[in-house]
C-alpha cells in the first residue's frame, strides 16, 4: 500500500496529534481541535500544547462547538499555497463545525491536478469538481488552464470558494449549488464529457433539497455514472474519509466501474507532524491515461 502526503506547505504545519486532538499552525495562528483518528498519546506535553495554542475548539454537541481564544487573534485570516507555477490563496475562518475552510492534506492532490491538467493535450480541458467544498482542487485546475465546474450543495461554501478564487487572482469558475449525485446523472443524460473528475465525498451529507448521502450506500452508484462522463483523455481523483472503507475497497470500486484503468495510484493519505507522528487522513485512488 502506498502512503501519500503533502510536501510543499509553508503556511501550514501539523505540530502534534494524539488523545483525539491535533495541534496545527495555519499561517501565524496555532489551532487546537478534535481529531477522531488520533488514538495514541500526544508526543508534546499538555503544557507545551497550552503554550503553543492560540485558540482551542470546545465540542458542545455531536456536530458543533465553539472556539476559545487563548490570545487575541482574528476570526478570519488568509494563507497561501505555492507549488511551482501554482500560487493560490485561501480565506480561513473559525467555524462552529471545527473546520476553518481548508483540508491541508489535499495539497498533494492539488499538485497532481495542476500537473495533470497541464499535460492534457486538449485546449482548455473540462474539469468537474464534486463535493468541492472551498475549492482548492478547483483553483489548481483553473490555474493550470482548465475549464472548471465546481459543485457543492451548500451555497455558503460556494460563496467561500468564490472568495478564494478572487483572492487567488483567478476567474471564470462555473459554480453549481446542487446535490452531486443529481448533477452527475443530469450530465450523463446530456451526453457531457470531462477530461478530469475530482471527488472528495463526505461520509454523511444532506443535499440542497434534503437528499441524504451516506458514502457506503452511494459511492458505487456515483462512480458508475461518472464512468460515463470521462472523455478519451482523462484523469480521476477520488479521496474518501471514512473509517468503513479501505484502499482495497477503493481498488475494487475503480476496477469494476472503469475500463482499462491506467497509472492507478492507491493508498492512504497522511500528514507528518513536527513531533514525528503520522496522522492518517483518508484514502486515495487516482488514475490517468495521459502519457508522462
Question: How does the language model describe each region?
Answer:
Residues 147-152:
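Conserved SAM-binding motif I beta-strand of class I
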Residues 154-198:
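S-adenosyl-L-methionine
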Residues 233-292:
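C-terminal catalytic and target-recognition region of SAM-dependent MTase-like enzymes
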Residues 104-122:
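Conserved alpha-helix/loop element of class I SAM-dependent methyltransferases that forms part
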Residues 134-146:
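Conserved SAM-binding loop of SAM-dependent methyltransferases across substrates and taxa
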Residues 123-133:
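Conserved class I S-adenosyl-L-methionine
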Residues 155-157, 177, 194-225:
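Mobile active-site "lid"/loop adjacent to the S-adenosyl-L-methionine
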Residues 10-24, 31-104, 111:
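Non-catalytic substrate-recognition/targeting regions of SAM-dependent transferases
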Amino acid at each position: 500500500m502506498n502512503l501519500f502526503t503533502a510536501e510543499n506547505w509553508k503556511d501550514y504545519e501539523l505540530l502534534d496529534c494524539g488523545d483525539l486532538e491535533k495541534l496545527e499552525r495555519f499561517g501565524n495562528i496555532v489551532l487546537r481541535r478534535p481529531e477522531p483518528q488520533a488514538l495514541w498519546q500526544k508526543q508534546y506535553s499538555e503544557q507545551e500544547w497550552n503554550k503553543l495554542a492560540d485558540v482551542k475548539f470546545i465540542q458542545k454537541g455531536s456536530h458543533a462547538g465553539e472556539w476559545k481564544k487563548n490570545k487575541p487573534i482574528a476570526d478570519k485570516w488568509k494563507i497561501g499555497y505555492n507549488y511551482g507555477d501554482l500560487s493560490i490563496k485561501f480565506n480561513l475562518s473559525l467555524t462552529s463545525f471545527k473546520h476553518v475552510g481548508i483540508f491541508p492534506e489535499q495539497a498533494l492532490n492539488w499538485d497532481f491536478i495542476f500537473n495533470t491538467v497541464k499535460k492534457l493535450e486538449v485546449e482548455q480541458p473540462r474539469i468537474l469538481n464534486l463535493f468541492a467544498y472551498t475549492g482548492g482542487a478547483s483553483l489548481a485546475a483553473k490555474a493550470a488552464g482548465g475549464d472548471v465546474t465546481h459543485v457543492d450543495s451548500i451555497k455558503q461554501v460556494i460563496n467561500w470558494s468564490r472568495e478564494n478564487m478572487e483572492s487567488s487572482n483567478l476567474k471564470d469558475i462555473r459554480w453549481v449549488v446542487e446535490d452531486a449525485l443529481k448533477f452527475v446523472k443530469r450530465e450523463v443524460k446530456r451526453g457531457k464529457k470531462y477530461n478530469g473528475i475530482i471527488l472528495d465525498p463526505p461520509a454523511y451529507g444532506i443535499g440542497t433539497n434534503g437528499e441524504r448521502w451516506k458514502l457506503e450506500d452511494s459511492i458505487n452508484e456515483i462512480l458508475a455514472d461518472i464512468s460515463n462522463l470521462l472523455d478519451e483523455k482523462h484523469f480521476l481523483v477520488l479521496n474518501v474519509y471514512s473509517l468503513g472503507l479501505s484502499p482495497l475497497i477503493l481498488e475494487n470500486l475503480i476496477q469494476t466501474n472503469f475500463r482499462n484503468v491506467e497509472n492507478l495510484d492507491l493508498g492512504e493519505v497522511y500528514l507528518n507532524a513536527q513531533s514525528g507522528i503520522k496522522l492518517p487522513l483518508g484514502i486515495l485512488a487516482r488514475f490517468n491515461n495521459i502519457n508522462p
